[in-house]
């Protein structure tokens, strides 16, 4: 395991846990997972993943130990989880709920950290973007995007490289009316009018899904009730349906631009040497 950081969502500050005054070694406790289940006479039922606690040993210089403790405690007090990131891509929301010293040295301390891992799985972001296949003078959005658009129209493919369905953030860019896309046979639709420069964002990566309408200045309001949810999960027209593993065919009208941000799932960060 390499390059581990703890980032405070409250203060937007990060502390390296990989040698910059704090060292967790291989972080063995982070490389574990456990399914909850119940046993019946001839079956296993209710298999699921959920929040859990792990223990990690760390050596820290005095100043870094103090900084990590203060940051983690402030996050916990604010009920604002921090973010663990491994190798710059695998993420897990967490709280450091206990920190104890087993040994002290001249300039540092040996720590035991108890970490509450909140997300069901570790996740990494994979972004796919699609635009209309025609334009007269190029795309000129009133705000910048953190990615480049690929020119595709009407159909395409989305790749979820993990082995499990992925939660996602789907964004429709105006102008469009009642925009929808079909990914892997499921239709994602919001019945709203989206003006030029505005966007509608379906987000089902958190504990509760949201659907927001933003104007060109970033001001937003909820349009959750306008998201189509016919048949519920697996019903074929459910706005919060996780994107299947592997390759999924995509279709849409081709008259508006949109993007899908996959949060690919894995039970543990990948081993790297």
Locate predicted features.
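A short, compositionally biased
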Residues: 1, 75-81, 173-177, 206-207
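Solvent-exposed edge beta-strands and adjacent loop segments
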Residues: 1-51, 89-101
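Short beta-strand and beta-hairpin "edge-sheet" elements
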Residues: 23-24, 83-127
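Oligomerization/assembly interface segments of phage tail-like spikes and tubes
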Residues: 33-64, 107-121, 248
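Solvent-exposed loop and beta-edge segments used for protein-protein assembly and interaction
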Residues: 48-50, 76, 105-109, 160-164, ...
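Short, acidic/charged, Gly/Pro-enriched secondary-structure junctions
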Residues: 59-100, 249
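Charged, amphipathic alpha-helical segments and their flanking helix caps
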Residues: 69-76, 124-125, 129-136
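Intrinsically disordered, low-complexity segments enriched in serine, threonine, and glycine
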Residues: 130-273
């Amino acid at each position: 395991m390499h390059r581990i950081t703890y980032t405070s969502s409250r203060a937007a500050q990060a502390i390296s846990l990989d040698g910059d005054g704090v060292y967790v070694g291989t972080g063995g406790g982070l490389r574990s997972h456990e399914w909850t289940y119940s046993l019946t006479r001839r079956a296993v039922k209710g298999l699921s993943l959920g929040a859990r606690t792990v223990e990690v040993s760390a050596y820290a210089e005095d100043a870094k130990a103090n900084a990590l403790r203060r940051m983690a405690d402030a996050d916990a007090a604010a009920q604002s989880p921090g973010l663990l990131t491994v190798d710059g891509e695998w993420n897990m929301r967490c709280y450091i709920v206990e920190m104890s010293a087993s040994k002290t040295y001249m300039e540092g301390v040996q720590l035991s950290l108890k970490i509450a891992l909140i997300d069901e799985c570790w996740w990494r972001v994979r972004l796919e973007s699609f635009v209309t296949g025609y334009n007269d003078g190029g795309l000129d959005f009133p705000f910048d995007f953190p990615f480049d658009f690929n020119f595709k129209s009407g159909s395409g493919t989305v790749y979820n490289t993990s082995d499990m369905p992925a939660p996602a953030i789907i964004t429709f860019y105006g102008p469009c009316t009642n925009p929808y896309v079909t990914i892997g046979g499921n239709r994602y639709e919001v019945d709203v009018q989206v003006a030029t420069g505005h966007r509608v964002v379906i987000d089902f990566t958190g504990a509760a899904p949201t659907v927001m309408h933003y104007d060109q200045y970033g001001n937003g309001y909820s349009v959750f009730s306008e998201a189509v949810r016919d048949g519920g999960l697996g019903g074929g027209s459910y706005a919060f349906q996780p994107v299947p593993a592997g390759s999924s065919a995509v279709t849409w009208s081709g008259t508006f631009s949109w993007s899908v941000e996959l949060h690919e799932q894995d039970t543990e960060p990948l081993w790297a040497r």
